[in-house]
Amino acid sequence: MNPIVINRLQRKLGYTFHHQELLQQALTHRSASSKHNERLEFLGDSILSFVIANALYHRFPRVDEGDMSRMRATLVRGNTLAEIAREFELGECLRLGPGELKSGGFRRESILADTVEALIGGVFLDSDIQNVERLILSWYQTRLDEISPGDKQKDPKTRLQEYLQGRHLPLPSYLVVQVRGEAHDQEFTIHCQVSGLSEPVVGTGSSRRKAEQAAAEQALKKLELE
């Protein structure tokens, strides 16, 4: 992998790996090698959830568990992680197999999100919980400053349903129109038909549920509720 690209990535991350093999593994998709990033992703997912939960607990001392859970879900969901990945220009650093390269895997939201979690796991193993917590909070500083409790933090499907019910309109319908990839690494494409929109909106995700949420979010944007 190009050392110039790797050094630039580490500057953007705000962390230089002592063990570069952990960074290489974090950037390696299972399509490229048997030594891939899924175990690091598993670890990073749990660490991220803890760090964000801890930050919200101390920032919002009077907010109940339900609102904190919704805020955490907003901050750790796939599209938020993919946004962070794009800020780091992570796509050009990924190690992907030929099939994923050809199909544009370096742009795929689920792969970008998973890689951010793998990087978190890698930083933890390369250093300690204090370092990785500091790093995550630096990545999330603006988002933590901007987030607030309330209905805005309900998931998109719930908000879309409540909007339509409040206007006595039919509930949205979700249809799977495409499933790509192998069983362990699928991408679902969903069409969501919403009363008031002339065409179905499209959402993609690594599971049917995530794709439906993505479609609902697009519908909310078209309805100018997002």
UniProtKB/Swiss-Prot annotation:
Transmembrane segments: none
Active site as annotated: 45, 117
Top EC class of this enzyme: hydrolase
Start and end residues of each DRBM domain: 155-225
EC number from the UniProt entry: 3.1.26.3
Binding site for Mg(2+): 41, 114, 117
Domain of life: Bacteria
Record GO biological process: mRNA processing; regulation of gene expression; rRNA processing; tRNA processing
Key words, A-Z: Cytoplasm, Endonuclease, Hydrolase, Magnesium, Metal-binding, mRNA processing, Nuclease, RNA-binding, rRNA processing, rRNA-binding, tRNA processing
Subcellular location: Cytoplasm
PROSITE patterns in the record: DS_RBD, RNASE_3_1, RNASE_3_2
CC cofactor: Mg(2+)
Signal peptide: none
Domain RNase III as annotated: residue spans: 6-128
Catalytic activity: Endonucleolytic cleavage to 5'-phosphomonoester
InterPro entries, alphabetized: dsRBD_dom (IPR014720), RNase_III (IPR011907), RNase_III_dom (IPR000999), RNase_III_sf (IPR036389)
GO function term, MF aspect, one: rRNA binding
Main localization of the protein described in the UniProt heading: cytoplasm
GO CC entries: cytoplasm
One Pfam family recorded for the sequence: dsrm
Keyword set includes Nucleotide-binding: no
NCBIfam families in UniProt: RNaseIII (TIGR02191)
Similarity comment: family membership: Belongs to the ribonuclease III family.
Subunit structure: Homodimer.
Main function: Digests double-stranded RNA. Involved in the processing of primary rRNA transcript to yield the immediate precursors to the large and small rRNAs (23S and 16S). Processes some mRNAs, and tRNAs when they are encoded in the rRNA operon. Processes pre-crRNA and tracrRNA of type II CRISPR loci if present in the organism.
Protein known as: Ribonuclease 3
